[in-house]
């Protein structure tokens, strides 16, 4: 088995490739989640507008949206933010320095303290 010597260049290339792969995976998962959320939101708004045909059009420049639709969009934005917060706190990551599982919302503060103390 032939192994290549570890140099700064190979180490930097390896770290860079790992970072790029993780960023691509995270972006892909986020995009897929957003697409699923938006499609379910569209399905629910379509069913609401079909059931409520007597909606009044708000006088907001004549863009054709009802006040119910505007409220629904605002509510969905608030719900999306709360979903993101719940996902952030319910997802755990393993600290490579000390080996503990840390909640996503606390990971940045943990890793800075953990690296300061050099726990292992």
UniProtKB/Swiss-Prot annotation:
The record's section on InterPro entries has: SAGA_su_Sgf11 (IPR013246)
Q: Which residues, by range, are in coiled-coil regions?
A: none
Stretches of Low complexity bias are at: 40-60
Q: Tell me which Gene Ontology terms the entry assigns under biological process.
A: chromatin organization
Mapped zinc finger ranges (SGF11-type)? 93-114
Compartmental location: Nucleus
The entry sums up its family as follows: Belongs to the SGF11 family.
Q: How does it assemble?
A: Component of the 1.8 MDa SAGA transcription coactivator-HAT complex. SAGA is built of 5 distinct domains with specialized functions. Within the SAGA complex, SUS1, SGF11, SGF73 and UBP8 form an additional subcomplex of SAGA called the DUB module (deubiquitination module). Interacts directly with SGF73, SUS1 and UBP8.
Q: What is this protein called?
A: SAGA-associated factor 11
Q: Provide the species name.
A: Candida albicans (strain SC5314 / ATCC MYA-2876) (Yeast)
The gene for this chain is SGF11
């Amino acid at each position: 088995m032939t192994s290549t010597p570890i140099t700064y260049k190979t180490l930097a290339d390896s770290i860079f490739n790992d970072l790029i792969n993780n960023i691509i995976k995270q972006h892909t998962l986020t995009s897929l989640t957003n697409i699923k959320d938006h499609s379910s939101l569209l399905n629910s708004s379509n069913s609401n507008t079909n059931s409520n045909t007597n909606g009044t059009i708000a006088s907001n420049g004549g863009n054709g949206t009802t006040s119910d639709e505007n409220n629904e969009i605002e509510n969905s934005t608030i719900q999306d933010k709360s979903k993101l917060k719940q996902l952030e706190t319910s997802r755990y990551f393993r600290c490579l320095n000390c080996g503990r599982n840390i909640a996503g919302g606390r990971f940045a503060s943990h890793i800075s303290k953990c690296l300061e103390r050099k726990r292992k």
